[in-house]
Amino acid sequence: SNPNNPAWICLTESELRTIGELATKYDTIVLEDLAYMGMDFRKELGHPFQAPFQATAARYTDNYVLMISGSKIFSYAGQRIAIAAISDKLRNRFYPALKERYGIGRFAESYALTFLYAASSGASHSAQYALAAMFKAAADGKLDFVGHTREYAHRAHRVKELFERHGFHIVYDKDQDEHVSDGFFFTVGYGSMPSSDLVAALLRYGICAISLTSTGSLQNGVRVCVSQMNREEQYDLLDRRLRDFAQDYARK
């Protein structure tokens, strides 16, 4: 995704290569969250079997588990479902420590029957059939799920412009030397105002966001999500509220 949640940046291809190579060197397993797969709108992703492809550490190591959410990439939010894609080499690997601790030594079985079984309530048959059908339609070029989610980029571009117009700045603004993409989330700050103070101040003007501090960030600011900006009048309303905020705080 871009920006990623809760890092607010996207790892570049060179960074992912480093992670993958180190995972192989030190025999470490990479758990890669691709919940917002394809939502880097700086690139023309989403054309099946055609470059460019989703950036991933899995290109550089066999020690990976990819987590992909149906509710995010397909906007299939009713019956929650996701997949954990394990490399063939890793899924068949036998770990004596897992056998001793859980009674199941092969990684895939231990991961599914010990961790996923305990951490989730499973998935309904209808959701499994639906996800399989959407994967097939996407692979066959019949479902442009990246194109459908591009709406979030349009919303983010408009909302970001409103915040910047009224004196806010983008906190996490670049992936190394490239500007972050417009996507589901972005981050803003207002001068040097602490995160918690900014959350409280915005609430007084009817604007809801979460503190960057709550996500482990050391930067001052808030996270903005554009998922509910789905009516034209909301942009005019946000513009007025941010204008009032800026006018009041410019006097302080």
What are these regions (language model features)?
Residues H125-Q128, A132, F145-E164, I170-G189:
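Conserved glycine-rich beta-strand-loop-beta hairpin in the small C-terminal domain of fold type I
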